Amino acid sequence: AVADADLVILAVPVGAVGRIAEQILPHMKSGAVLTDTGSTKRSVVRDVAPHLRDDIIWLPSHPLAGTEHSGPGAGFESLFDERYWIILPLDADEAAIVRFESFITGLGSVTERMSPDYHDKVLALTSHLPHLIAYTIVGTAVDLETQLKNDVIRFSASGFRDFTRIAASDPVMWRDVFLNNDTAVLEMLQRFSEDLSYLQRAIRWQEGDKLEALFSRTREIRRSIIDAGQD
């Protein structure tokens, strides 16, 4: 299936990228481009490296688009519109990178170049940690006593419903994300834990000024996201 392809996209959980690359690379034609859509990049670069050929253009990438649904049926026409698609140039030829970027912008996306390490740090905070928090909050609800759990579900407000949507994401995919971006996720989780402890102390000691100051700062992040067209 890949023998005549000019571009091959590995759209599988990050834990499977290396294995799939090993299977298909021998059959790809010379000069073809290989990319992926994984949410962790250091592990993908590491896992694909042993199987690469000198005549294949390897351009790891990550489209920042999608929903809690997965698989071919989860796609829709405007999925990539105005969404960032991160490219990791590595050692690829500039002309090949530009051609790939043209393909991406043709889908409606905006391209951005990053290194593997920087990508994984950014995504640890903007994507991976929020998913971990969502899984934890919904898991806490699951473990409540029956009556309380039922009422939590029955009277769930928009905030909790948003968490349940995120927590409905594919468990295998996210298992692989956390195991393969463990260093960056743990670093961001430590920072989050310290900030959470700060909030805990502020609530305990009725320090409303500290709470209000934090909430005011975080509103600016929301406004920045809207201004950037990433709402």
What are these model-derived regions, one by one?
Residues 1-33:
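Rossmann-like NAD(P)-binding element
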Residues 7, 57, 110:
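Residue-level detector of anion-binding/catalytic polar loops
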Residues 9, 51-54, 75-79, 128-132:
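Short, hinge-like loop/turn segments at secondary-structure boundaries
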Residues 11-13, 38, 89:
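Glycine-rich, N-terminal phosphate-binding loop of Rossmann-like dinucleotide-binding domains
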Residues 20-73:
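Rossmann-like NAD(P)(H) cofactor-binding subdomain of soluble oxidoreductases
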Residues 149-218:
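Interdomain hinge/lid region at the active-site interface
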Residues 220-231:
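Long, positively charged, glycine-interspersed low-complexity recognition regions
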